[in-house]
Amino acid sequence: MTTKDTKDRQHLNVTIVTHSEGKDMPINFKYKKRHEREKPMALDVLLQAQETKLPDLAFRYGCRARNCGVCTIDINGLPRIACRSVVRENDKLKAMSTLPVITDLVVRRDQISRQLRGKIYRNSGGNDLNVDASEDYHELTSCIECYACLHNCPMHQKNSIDPSESNESYEYGNPFSLLKLQTIVMDPVSSNSQKNDAITQAVNLGLDTCLNCPGCKCGIGIDLKGKVVDPLITASKKIADEQF
C-alpha cells in the first residue's frame, strides 16, 4: 500500500455550502478520520470543519441522538438528520432547500411551528377517562420535528420561502402540520367538536393538494400517507357529505 493510498483512507472529501447575504458559497473540506474505518456522521464533519477550517460556520444541533430534529440539512439535495446520517466521499452538505436560509446551514423554522398557533386546542386536563391511545397515535407523537417531510410536498411548495418576507407563518400546510392535526383527531380525550375543528383546519391549509400526491416521506419513518394524510382526507369527505 502506498503512502498516498493510506492518506486517502484517512480523509474524506466533502463540499460544505455556506450561505451569506443571499449567496451560496461551496467550500471543499477534507475531513480527517479518527480511525481508518470511521464512517462519520454529517454532524461530525460540520463540527470538525468549524474547529479547523471554518470557525464561523453556522449550523444547528441539539441532542445528537436523533431525538430533536434541529440538525436536519440537505445531503446531496435530500433532507437528512445530520447527527445520524453517514457522509461519504464527495457528498455535498447544504442548508435545507425547503425553508428560508438565514446563514450557512441554518434555516428559519418558526414559520412552521407557528402555523397552528391559536388554531388548535391544547389538552391540559389529562386523560381523566383513563382511555388508552392507539399504537398509531403513539407513532405520530414520536415526530421529532425535523421537517424532512417538506421535501417535494406540493402543498408546502405553494408557500413563498423568500427570506426577505417576514410572515409569521405559512398560508399553506405541510405534512408536519397535518400530523399535528391528525394527532388531535386520534387523541382519545378529544371531543367530537375538537376533532372536527382539526379536520377543518387541515382542509383550510390545503388538504385537497394531497389528493394527487404519491405521498410524503418522514425523516424517521412515520407512515405519513397511511396514518395522517389518507385518514384526514377520508374524514373531511365524511364531514362534507354530512353537510349536504
Where are these regions (language model features)?
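Iron-sulfur-associated redox domains of electron-transfer enzymes in respiratory
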Residues: 2-109, 150, 154, 159
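Ferredoxin-type iron-sulfur electron-transfer modules in oxidoreductases and energy-metabolism complexes
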Residues: 40-52, 96-244
